[in-house]
Regions:
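Donor nucleotide-sugar binding/catalytic pocket of nucleotide-sugar-dependent glycosyltransferases
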Residues: 134, 138-178, 188-194, 245
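Conserved donor-binding/catalytic core segment of Leloir-type glycosyltransferases
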Residues: 181-202, 208-212, 222
């Protein structure tokens, strides 16, 4: 099936790496593996992060124009007519101004992956975007949810409850390292995250606070990532001194190589939906210590693949890291379980099979 693919927050070919870009790329790979033909139909970014109503209005108008151009293209070249529209990551700051219009005009199914709705945004600075997302969800033939916490607010908007389709976050496990036994007296900790203000910086600050309580133990920390909050992140970890190695921004292959050399993934995950880096670490056979925020518990299973700590609790986070570092056998058990769980539940072929079932059930002519 020819599928029009669109990611309003960040297209899969965007030059700046991020979890959103990675997930968009993974969805493209999964759709191809399921036997379909996804085509990126637009790189238009509808994201507006400052609550600027005028800019949001301009983006909405631009989105309408692009949607009309896409429809004109379909009329001119009917051999490229899509049979289904698939949008990834739609929320109030990045509404989908293209998919509902094009899918509705063509009479094809409209599918959204990772849509989220926050009722409080209905009267906030992104109210127009919020209403657009609600409208898109009402039109959707299926909403694929990666985070179970989104379900409660989305279900009331769907035409039927069965249109919510749960899909576990996934990676291509074949690209990550094999399981290995922990080695050496000084465990190698690793954190992988962009350096942005807000939630990412909050996680780095909590990480610095937590690890500063463990200076009586031998360990090292690699930090993979970069961004506009780099100076603030360095200040957050300044008490760790020479124990930290700053790796900067790395490509996918280099990140996989660093994960393969580490012993423990540590990340507070403040206000994160689920965290792709945590899933990559688990695929690499790394146990994790993480904050129990958002959908992180769907990635790190407590006492099975790692430990979860109450959000924002630096002493508890430090205690959890200490306990895993000091117990080599426990760390090895977590590592094996982490890799196995990814292969069984979070691997690309598993996701491709599930997506294939959903799309095949919709068919090219089921849109209401």
């Amino acid at each position: 099936m020819r599928i029009a693919f669109y990611a309003p927050l960040k297209p899969p070919d965007h030059p700046v790496p991020s979890g959103d870009r990675q997930i968009a790329q993974l969805f493209l790979a999964a759709l191809r593996l399921a036997g379909h033909e996804p085509v990126l139909v637009s790189c238009f970014r509808s994201f507006e992060g400052y609550g600027d109503a005028l800019r949001q209005a301009r983006l909405a108008v631009l989105g309408e124009r692009i949607a009309n151009r896409l429809l004109s293209h379909c009329q001119e070249f009917p051999e490229f007519l899509p049979e289904l529209w698939f949008s990834y990551h739609v929320y109030h700051k990045a509404p989908d101004w293209l998919g509902p219009a094009v899918a509705g005009a063509l009479g094809i199914p409209y599918v959204v992956a990772e849509a989220s709705v926050t009722p409080m945004q209905g009267s906030g600075p992104w109210a127009d975007g919020h209403r657009a997302v609600e409208s898109a969800i009402r039109q959707a033939d299926a909403v694929i949810g990666l985070n179970s916490e989104d379900r409660e607010c989305i279900l009331p908007l769907l035409r039927e409850p069965w249109r919510w389709v749960a899909l576990k976050p996934f990676v291509d496990a074949a690209t990550y390292g094999r399981i290995r036994e922990p080695e050496g007296e000084a465990p190698r900790l690793i954190a992988v995250a962009m350096m942005r203000h807000g939630d990412k910086l909050a996680s780095y600050r909590l990480l610095g606070d937590s690890l500063s309580r463990l200076l009586d133990l031998p360990w090292s920390l690699e930090v993979v990532g970069d961004g506009p909050a780099r100076c603030d992140v360095e200040n957050a970890l300044v008490r760790l001194n020479e124990r930290v190695t700053w790796m900067g921004s790395l490509d996918h292959e280099a990140i996989a190589a660093r994960l393969a050399l580490a012993d423990l993934f540590v990340w507070p995950a403040c206000n994160e939906a689920f965290g792709m880096a945590l899933l990559e670490a688990q695929a690499s056979g790394l146990p994790g210590v993480a904050g129990a925020d958002g959908g992180v518990a769907e990635i790190v299973v407590p006492e099975v693949t790692g430990l979860l700590v109450a959000p924002g609790d630096a002493p508890a986070f430090a205690a959890a890291v200490r306990s895993v570092m000091l117990d080599h056998g426990r760390r090895a058990t977590f590592a094996k379980a982490a890799r196995q769980r990814v292969l069984l539940e979070h691997d690309l072929p598993v996701a491709a099979h599930r997506l294939g079932e959903v799309i095949d059930a919709l068919g090219p002519a089921c849109a209401a």
